[in-house]
A protein has these predicted regions:
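Cofactor-pocket helix-loop regions in the catalytic cores of large enzyme subunits
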Residues: 1-182
Length: 183
């Protein structure tokens, strides 16, 4: 985890919960996420299942299973197209931006909506909400990692966090929930 549990549930404006059902698998964290939402934090749920937290979400994206990377690429494409990139962070702390931008260019909202079986409007809402938030952690679990593209999914989430400068500061980061530490 890049941030503490307290940090990502108390200092966040938006939580991006991806492929995770913390109220079932990590109940203490699930309770803290629910409390954060009750205290005004917005929640984006990306999960094909109707998990309990989806009812509290500002947007619930029920992706077709196996389309995580296409979805994240679509989010990054929108972030770039809408001018929401943290240019200073990208310039000073990353490399390969041009290659990333070239790669995600083909993942238009319409194409991603078709691939993932979601609405364009929901994809756009999630991308803008996440990118514009001052503090927004990505919290993910087995719904991301236990796929043939799990490694690419995690790397894509990290790339998206860096694209908007949400790494290395409170209430942000890329945060896996697992059964054991350092899995």
């Amino acid at each position: 985890m890049t941030n503490t549990i307290y940090d990502i549930t108390h200092d966040a404006d938006v939580i991006l919960l991806f492929g995770s059902n913390p109220e079932e698998a990590h109940p203490v964290i699930g309770m803290q996420i629910r409390q954060a939402v009750q205290n005004g934090t917005k929640l984006i749920v990306v999960d094909p299942r109707d998990i309990n937290l989806a009812g509290a979400a500002s947007v619930h994206l029920k992706l077709k299973p196996g389309t995580n990377v296409a979805f994240i690429n679509g989010m990054m494409n929108l972030i770039i197209q809408k001018g929401l990139v943290d240019k200073e962070f990208v310039e000073n702390r990353t490399e390969g931006y041009e290659k990333l931008a070239e790669t995600v260019r083909e993942y238009t909202p319409e194409k991603v909506a078709e691939i993932c079986h979601i609405r364009v409007e929901d994809l756009e809402k999630a991308a803008v909400m996440y990118a514009r938030a001052e503090a927004a952690p990505i919290i993910y679990c087995l719904g991301v990692t236990e796929h043939s593209t799990g490694t690419q999914g995690v790397m894509s989430l990290a790339n998206m966090a860096m694209l908007v400068g949400k790494l290395g500061k409170p209430g942000c980061g890329v945060n896996p929930l697992r059964g054991q530490n350092n899995v």
